[in-house]
Amino acid sequence: MRVVPLGFESLGVRSMATLIETPDVTVLVDPGVSIPPKRYNLPPSEEEWEALEEVRESIQRAADSADVVTISHYHYDHHTPFTDRKYEACDLETAKELYRDKLILMKHPTENINRSQAGRARALIEGLDELGVDYEFADGKRFEFGETVLEFSQPLPHGPEGTRLGYVLGLRITHRDHVIVHASDVQGPVYGPALEWILERDPDLVLISGPPTYLLGFRFSSDNLEKAVKNLRKLASRSGQIILDHHLLRDKNYRDRLSEVYEESDNVASAAEVLGKEERLLEAYRDELSGEE
Protein backbone atom coordinates (compact mmCIF):
# COMPACT_ATOMS: atom_id res chain seq x y z
CA MET A 1 0.00 0.00 0.00
CA ARG A 2 1.08 3.56 -0.67
CA VAL A 3 0.26 6.19 1.96
CA VAL A 4 0.56 9.91 1.18
CA PRO A 5 -0.12 12.43 3.98
CA LEU A 6 -1.63 15.46 2.24
CA GLY A 7 -2.35 17.89 5.06
CA PHE A 8 -1.32 17.90 8.71
CA GLU A 9 -0.25 20.50 11.25
CA SER A 10 3.38 19.61 10.57
CA LEU A 11 2.67 20.70 6.99
CA GLY A 12 1.31 24.07 8.13
CA VAL A 13 -2.47 23.54 8.33
CA ARG A 14 -5.23 21.88 10.33
CA SER A 15 -5.94 18.59 8.58
CA MET A 16 -5.44 14.83 8.57
CA ALA A 17 -6.13 14.39 4.85
CA THR A 18 -4.42 11.26 3.55
CA LEU A 19 -4.38 9.37 0.25
CA ILE A 20 -4.09 5.59 0.54
CA GLU A 21 -3.58 3.49 -2.59
CA THR A 22 -3.85 -0.29 -2.88
CA PRO A 23 -3.87 -2.45 -6.04
CA ASP A 24 -7.68 -2.56 -5.74
CA VAL A 25 -8.82 0.90 -4.69
CA THR A 26 -7.62 4.43 -3.99
CA VAL A 27 -9.04 6.01 -0.85
CA LEU A 28 -9.03 9.70 0.10
CA VAL A 29 -9.39 9.94 3.88
CA ASP A 30 -10.82 13.02 5.63
CA PRO A 31 -10.48 15.49 2.72
CA GLY A 32 -10.63 18.73 4.65
CA VAL A 33 -8.23 21.53 5.52
CA SER A 34 -8.49 24.75 7.49
CA ILE A 35 -6.60 27.42 9.37
CA PRO A 36 -8.03 29.14 12.46
CA PRO A 37 -9.21 32.75 12.06
CA LYS A 38 -7.59 33.62 15.41
CA ARG A 39 -4.64 32.25 17.39
CA TYR A 40 -2.90 34.36 20.02
CA ASN A 41 -5.66 36.81 19.06
CA LEU A 42 -3.90 37.22 15.71
CA PRO A 43 -5.11 36.50 12.15
CA PRO A 44 -3.31 33.95 9.96
CA SER A 45 0.15 34.80 8.69
CA GLU A 46 0.92 34.97 4.98
CA GLU A 47 2.74 31.65 5.32
CA GLU A 48 -0.45 30.03 6.64
CA TRP A 49 -2.53 31.31 3.74
CA GLU A 50 0.03 29.91 1.32
CA ALA A 51 0.08 26.53 3.09
CA LEU A 52 -3.73 26.43 3.04
CA GLU A 53 -3.79 26.90 -0.73
CA GLU A 54 -1.02 24.34 -1.23
CA VAL A 55 -2.78 21.66 0.79
CA ARG A 56 -6.15 22.41 -0.78
CA GLU A 57 -4.58 21.91 -4.20
CA SER A 58 -3.01 18.64 -3.02
CA ILE A 59 -6.37 17.38 -1.78
CA GLN A 60 -8.11 18.30 -5.03
CA ARG A 61 -5.41 16.57 -7.09
CA ALA A 62 -5.67 13.49 -4.90
CA ALA A 63 -9.43 13.44 -5.40
CA ASP A 64 -8.90 13.10 -9.15
CA SER A 65 -7.41 9.64 -8.63
CA ALA A 66 -9.60 8.50 -5.72
CA ASP A 67 -12.38 5.94 -5.99
CA VAL A 68 -13.58 6.28 -2.39
CA VAL A 69 -13.76 9.22 0.01
CA THR A 70 -14.09 8.58 3.74
CA ILE A 71 -15.24 11.11 6.35
CA SER A 72 -14.63 10.38 10.02
CA HIS A 73 -16.70 13.31 11.31
CA TYR A 74 -17.96 16.72 10.28
CA HIS A 75 -15.43 19.26 11.50
CA TYR A 76 -14.30 21.40 8.58
CA ASP A 77 -10.68 20.25 8.79
CA HIS A 78 -11.92 16.72 8.02
CA HIS A 79 -14.37 17.26 5.17
CA THR A 80 -15.07 19.83 2.47
CA PRO A 81 -18.50 21.52 2.62
CA PHE A 82 -20.58 22.70 -0.33
CA THR A 83 -20.21 26.34 0.74
CA ASP A 84 -17.85 29.28 0.33
CA ARG A 85 -15.43 29.21 3.26
CA LYS A 86 -12.37 31.43 3.29
CA TYR A 87 -10.47 29.62 6.03
CA GLU A 88 -11.03 26.26 4.32
CA ALA A 89 -10.14 27.52 0.82
CA CYS A 90 -13.28 26.02 -0.68
CA ASP A 91 -16.52 26.83 -2.45
CA LEU A 92 -19.35 24.97 -4.16
CA GLU A 93 -17.25 23.99 -7.17
CA THR A 94 -14.41 22.76 -4.95
CA ALA A 95 -16.78 20.32 -3.25
CA LYS A 96 -18.37 19.20 -6.51
CA GLU A 97 -14.97 18.44 -8.03
CA LEU A 98 -13.87 16.57 -4.92
CA TYR A 99 -16.90 14.32 -4.45
CA ARG A 100 -18.05 13.78 -8.05
CA ASP A 101 -18.07 10.12 -9.19
CA LYS A 102 -16.85 8.87 -5.80
CA LEU A 103 -18.31 6.48 -3.26
CA ILE A 104 -18.55 8.41 0.02
CA LEU A 105 -18.24 6.37 3.23
CA MET A 106 -19.18 8.68 6.05
CA LYS A 107 -20.14 8.89 9.69
CA HIS A 108 -23.85 8.61 10.45
CA PRO A 109 -25.38 12.11 10.31
CA THR A 110 -27.91 11.78 13.14
CA GLU A 111 -26.62 9.13 15.55
CA ASN A 112 -23.85 9.76 18.10
CA ILE A 113 -23.40 13.33 16.93
CA ASN A 114 -23.68 16.80 18.44
CA ARG A 115 -25.92 19.56 17.12
CA SER A 116 -23.19 21.48 15.29
CA GLN A 117 -21.91 18.47 13.38
CA ALA A 118 -25.45 17.25 12.67
CA GLY A 119 -26.14 20.51 10.87
CA ARG A 120 -22.96 20.22 8.84
CA ALA A 121 -23.73 16.59 8.00
CA ARG A 122 -27.20 17.54 6.81
CA ALA A 123 -25.77 20.25 4.55
CA LEU A 124 -23.17 17.86 3.15
CA ILE A 125 -25.77 15.21 2.36
CA GLU A 126 -27.93 17.78 0.58
CA GLY A 127 -24.95 18.64 -1.60
CA LEU A 128 -24.15 14.99 -2.28
CA ASP A 129 -27.78 14.31 -3.21
CA GLU A 130 -27.78 17.21 -5.67
CA LEU A 131 -24.53 15.91 -7.13
CA GLY A 132 -26.01 12.42 -7.46
CA VAL A 133 -23.15 10.51 -5.85
CA ASP A 134 -23.43 7.32 -3.82
CA TYR A 135 -22.82 7.41 -0.09
CA GLU A 136 -23.18 5.06 2.85
CA PHE A 137 -23.11 5.59 6.60
CA ALA A 138 -20.11 3.56 7.66
CA ASP A 139 -20.33 3.31 11.46
CA GLY A 140 -19.11 -0.17 12.48
CA LYS A 141 -19.26 -1.45 8.90
CA ARG A 142 -16.88 -3.32 6.60
CA PHE A 143 -16.43 -2.75 2.86
CA GLU A 144 -14.50 -5.01 0.46
CA PHE A 145 -12.77 -3.95 -2.76
CA GLY A 146 -11.02 -6.99 -4.19
CA GLU A 147 -8.37 -7.96 -1.65
CA THR A 148 -8.66 -4.60 0.12
CA VAL A 149 -10.93 -4.22 3.15
CA LEU A 150 -12.07 -0.97 4.76
CA GLU A 151 -13.28 -1.49 8.32
CA PHE A 152 -14.78 1.35 10.34
CA SER A 153 -15.04 1.52 14.11
CA GLN A 154 -18.19 2.22 16.02
CA PRO A 155 -18.29 5.91 16.99
CA LEU A 156 -15.44 6.87 19.33
CA PRO A 157 -15.35 10.03 21.47
CA HIS A 158 -13.63 13.05 19.94
CA GLY A 159 -11.14 12.94 22.83
CA PRO A 160 -12.14 12.08 26.41
CA GLU A 161 -15.28 10.14 27.25
CA GLY A 162 -18.21 12.53 27.59
CA THR A 163 -16.68 15.27 25.45
CA ARG A 164 -19.08 17.77 23.88
CA LEU A 165 -17.11 17.61 20.63
CA GLY A 166 -19.02 14.55 19.46
CA TYR A 167 -17.80 11.30 17.93
CA VAL A 168 -15.47 10.10 15.19
CA LEU A 169 -14.93 6.92 13.19
CA GLY A 170 -11.61 5.10 13.16
CA LEU A 171 -10.64 3.46 9.88
CA ARG A 172 -8.64 0.30 9.23
CA ILE A 173 -7.49 -0.47 5.69
CA THR A 174 -6.00 -3.87 4.94
CA HIS A 175 -4.53 -5.38 1.80
CA ARG A 176 -3.41 -8.96 2.28
CA ASP A 177 -1.17 -8.78 5.37
CA HIS A 178 -0.62 -4.99 5.33
CA VAL A 179 -2.66 -2.98 7.86
CA ILE A 180 -3.10 0.79 8.20
CA VAL A 181 -5.19 2.56 10.84
CA HIS A 182 -6.26 6.20 10.45
CA ALA A 183 -7.52 7.55 13.79
CA SER A 184 -8.75 11.12 13.45
CA ASP A 185 -9.28 13.33 16.50
CA VAL A 186 -9.08 10.69 19.22
CA GLN A 187 -6.71 13.13 20.97
CA GLY A 188 -4.11 10.65 22.10
CA PRO A 189 -6.05 8.44 22.29
CA VAL A 190 -7.35 9.54 25.67
CA TYR A 191 -10.23 7.05 25.68
CA GLY A 192 -9.12 3.53 26.63
CA PRO A 193 -11.52 1.65 24.31
CA ALA A 194 -10.22 3.75 21.38
CA LEU A 195 -6.71 2.50 22.14
CA GLU A 196 -7.95 -1.07 22.38
CA TRP A 197 -9.74 -0.79 19.05
CA ILE A 198 -6.50 0.34 17.40
CA LEU A 199 -4.36 -2.34 19.05
CA GLU A 200 -6.82 -5.08 18.11
CA ARG A 201 -6.39 -4.06 14.47
CA ASP A 202 -2.64 -4.96 14.74
CA PRO A 203 -1.50 -2.10 12.47
CA ASP A 204 1.78 -1.72 10.61
CA LEU A 205 1.13 2.03 10.40
CA VAL A 206 -1.06 4.30 12.52
CA LEU A 207 -1.94 7.88 11.61
CA ILE A 208 -3.26 9.48 14.77
CA SER A 209 -4.10 12.84 16.30
CA GLY A 210 -2.16 13.55 19.47
CA PRO A 211 -3.52 15.31 22.56
CA PRO A 212 -4.30 19.05 22.24
CA THR A 213 -1.63 20.19 24.70
CA TYR A 214 -2.03 23.79 23.51
CA LEU A 215 -5.36 23.72 25.37
CA LEU A 216 -3.86 22.29 28.56
CA GLY A 217 -5.55 23.74 31.64
CA PHE A 218 -8.27 25.29 29.50
CA ARG A 219 -10.16 22.65 27.52
CA PHE A 220 -7.82 19.72 28.13
CA SER A 221 -6.92 18.56 31.62
CA SER A 222 -3.63 17.30 33.06
CA ASP A 223 -5.42 14.06 33.90
CA ASN A 224 -6.38 13.57 30.26
CA LEU A 225 -2.82 14.34 29.18
CA GLU A 226 -1.54 11.63 31.50
CA LYS A 227 -4.01 9.17 29.98
CA ALA A 228 -2.98 10.16 26.46
CA VAL A 229 0.73 9.74 27.22
CA LYS A 230 0.15 6.35 28.85
CA ASN A 231 -1.94 5.14 25.92
CA LEU A 232 0.48 6.46 23.32
CA ARG A 233 3.40 4.75 25.03
CA LYS A 234 1.48 1.50 24.92
CA LEU A 235 0.63 2.05 21.27
CA ALA A 236 4.25 2.90 20.42
CA SER A 237 5.49 -0.28 22.08
CA ARG A 238 3.01 -2.55 20.30
CA SER A 239 2.60 -1.21 16.77
CA GLY A 240 4.77 -0.32 13.79
CA GLN A 241 5.26 3.19 12.46
CA ILE A 242 3.18 5.94 14.10
CA ILE A 243 2.47 9.25 12.41
CA LEU A 244 1.60 11.40 15.43
CA ASP A 245 0.37 14.82 14.38
CA HIS A 246 -2.70 17.09 14.17
CA HIS A 247 -3.84 18.62 17.52
CA LEU A 248 -0.50 17.94 19.21
CA LEU A 249 1.51 19.98 16.73
CA ARG A 250 -0.39 23.17 17.51
CA ASP A 251 1.98 23.39 20.49
CA LYS A 252 5.53 24.72 20.03
CA ASN A 253 6.71 22.49 22.87
CA TYR A 254 4.96 19.31 21.81
CA ARG A 255 8.08 17.12 21.94
CA ASP A 256 8.88 18.17 25.50
CA ARG A 257 5.31 17.56 26.63
CA LEU A 258 5.30 14.05 25.14
CA SER A 259 8.97 13.22 25.69
CA GLU A 260 8.05 9.86 27.26
CA VAL A 261 6.32 8.81 24.05
CA TYR A 262 9.23 9.74 21.80
CA GLU A 263 11.62 7.95 24.14
CA GLU A 264 9.44 4.82 23.95
CA SER A 265 10.04 4.25 20.25
CA ASP A 266 12.04 5.59 17.32
CA ASN A 267 9.05 4.89 15.09
CA VAL A 268 7.02 7.92 16.20
CA ALA A 269 7.20 10.85 13.78
CA SER A 270 5.19 13.70 12.30
CA ALA A 271 3.75 13.59 8.80
CA ALA A 272 6.39 16.06 7.62
CA GLU A 273 9.20 13.89 8.99
CA VAL A 274 7.83 10.79 7.27
CA LEU A 275 7.71 12.74 4.01
CA GLY A 276 11.29 13.92 4.51
CA LYS A 277 10.19 17.53 4.88
CA GLU A 278 10.93 20.20 7.45
CA GLU A 279 8.12 20.69 9.97
CA ARG A 280 6.12 23.88 9.48
CA LEU A 281 4.23 24.53 12.71
CA LEU A 282 2.74 27.69 11.30
CA GLU A 283 -0.23 27.95 13.65
CA ALA A 284 1.90 27.31 16.72
CA TYR A 285 4.37 30.00 15.64
CA ARG A 286 1.80 32.51 14.41
CA ASP A 287 2.84 35.02 17.07
CA GLU A 288 6.43 34.97 15.84
CA LEU A 289 5.53 34.90 12.15
CA SER A 290 3.33 37.94 12.73
CA GLY A 291 6.16 39.74 14.50
CA GLU A 292 4.12 40.11 17.69
CA GLU A 293 5.74 37.59 20.00
Swiss-Prot record:
Pfam family, one: Lactamase_B_3
SUPFAM superfamilies on file: Metallo-hydrolase/oxidoreductase (SSF56281)
InterPro entries documented for this protein: RibonucZ/Hydroxyglut_hydro, UPF0173_UPF0282_UlaG_hydrolase, UPF0282_hydrls
Family: Belongs to the UPF0282 family.
UniProt xrefs under PANTHER family: UPF0173 METAL-DEPENDENT HYDROLASE MJ1163-RELATED, UPF0282 PROTEIN MJ1629
Protein name: UPF0282 protein MK0213
